[in-house]
Regions:
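Low-complexity, intrinsically disordered or signal/transmembrane-proximal segments
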Residues: 2-5, 10, 19
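Serine/threonine-rich low-complexity intrinsically disordered regions
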Residues: 8, 22-25, 102
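Short, Lys/Arg-enriched N-terminal segments with co-localized hydrophobic residues
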Residues: 15-34
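N-terminal intrinsically disordered, cationic/polar leader segments
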Residues: 30-60, 70-132
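Short, conserved glycine- and acidic-residue-centered signature motifs
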Residues: 61-65
Length: 132
């Protein structure tokens, strides 16, 4: 039985509840392009999706974006005095500042954007960044 998954505006089907990341893998049917979506709005950061650049476990695009997001989230908690609402699961992460946004957190988000924009420039078919 096939399961339907929706990630933002990108839809894909997979069998057996597993995602291989390999677009040529048997049982993986693409309805639309797999892509990591990164949205930054008023210093809230949301990362969702899977790049599909390489098979699961060896996808350098996913690994790069994940490392940058995890560093942002942990750095915000450890290096600033702010309070944040966070949500993380496979293929999804979100951090939202609660209350006043500190200059330290603004710097962390700016650094995160430099990193993900670099990845998006190198892999434009796999990562898109929307920032205000």
């Amino acid at each position: 039985m096939q399961e339907l998954y929706k990630i933002d505006t990108h839809i894909f089907l997979r069998n057996n509840g597993t995602y291989s990341g390999d677009l040529r893998a048997p049982g993986l049917f693409i309805e639309d392009t797999l892509m990591i979506q990164i949205k930054v709005n008023n210093y809230s950061v949301e990362v969702s999706g899977h790049a599909g650049y390489m098979p699961h476990g060896s996808d350098i695009v996913c690994a790069g974006v994940s490392a940058l997001y995890q560093t942002l989230e942990e750095s915000a908690k450890e290096l600033t005095d702010g309070t944040y609402k966070t949500s993380s699961e496979a293929g999804y992460g979100r951090i939202c500042p609660i209350g006043e946004v500190s200059n330290e957190y603004k710097l962390l988000v700016s650094s995160f954007l430099i990193g993900v924009n670099g990845i998006a420039a190198s892999y434009p078919d796999y990562v898109i960044v929307h920032a205000d």
